Amino acid sequence: MIKNLLITFLSLTVFGFILYHLGVFDNLNSAGRDERSLHSEKRTETVRKTPEFMIGSVYNSIDIPAAESVKGAMLASEILRSNGMKIKYITVSNCQKRPETAAALQKMCVDYRTGAFLGPGNSEMLTSLRAISQFYALPLISPVTVRPDKLPQLEYDNYVSIFPPLEKWIDAILAHMKGNNIKKILIITPGDGTYGEMFSSVLERNSKNVLNDFQTYRMTYPHPLRTNYFNNSLTNYGGQHKVDAIFFGGVADELPELMQILKNHNINLPVYVSDDIIRNEIKMPAGTAFKLFLPEAEVPVSNAKWMELYVKKYKKQPSYHAVLGAETMFVMAEKFNKSIYTPESFVKAIEHASLEFNKKIKIRIIDFSTGKL
């Protein structure tokens, strides 16, 4: 009996040893790992074998910050190629809705030759696009989005932004308000999930730490009924509470309506907006007397050749969104090392570079009526 058991045990041991050397248990181990790790390993292996550093972008061509950042990044990639770097920048520009954008990103994710994704160009798309790219272990490097407070924490976070953090923008706005002796503001903001709502929340929270005796009154409006909300809030708060200024967290398309209501009610309070509204989007109603202040980033250009070619090609100075797109491309090219590339190590390298880069960026407040600080 014992002899038979011993023979059986030895037979199983030898059989297991043979299976081990045939690699059968390797497949079982792989099946037990999480899928993200498998995608990461596959991307690492494929990117290292691919002749070119492949970068993708998906954006809406009518979204000015996104389009400008891609324009800057594209020109930067052309300079890198002319300098001998093997780099390929693939863009998809006709994605106006979330499902289209998500589908285009997923297509890039499953092409494991893609080493990084430059984007997204819209903060409202961030959560869903981050989830997709996180699953497929594709680094998500954005020139023009900020990290929301409510963004879920992940063990392996694949998202990095080169864009200045919200606090930097808000500190500049609050410092400008303090310099103009503003102590009471009416915050008019769109609903949850929008960039304006996120910006307004941080502004309201940080104002209490920066300005003494600072008071905020907040009104959140739904898009379909915004005209009534604008009217009620401006007549009630503008007169009854005597606020010193208004902060508007909406988008450029909504600003003229707000301005017209201010004009109709003869309210000449200064209006501050977020970085989501840029100069060439603004159309002021005729005869407006109030001040409009908007923040702009002063971003240093690291590559003189890029600036020279941009002005020559587009016959104008680049927007800061275009510069951020270019600098993101240059940073990714600098930190990419094919022989040691992994999605995780690449993200860490970009994170460190982003912190250093943001130290060089200054935020200034522009008076739209004069174009001066």
Predicted segments, located by residue:
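Extracytosolic ligand-binding ectodomains
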Residues: 2-373
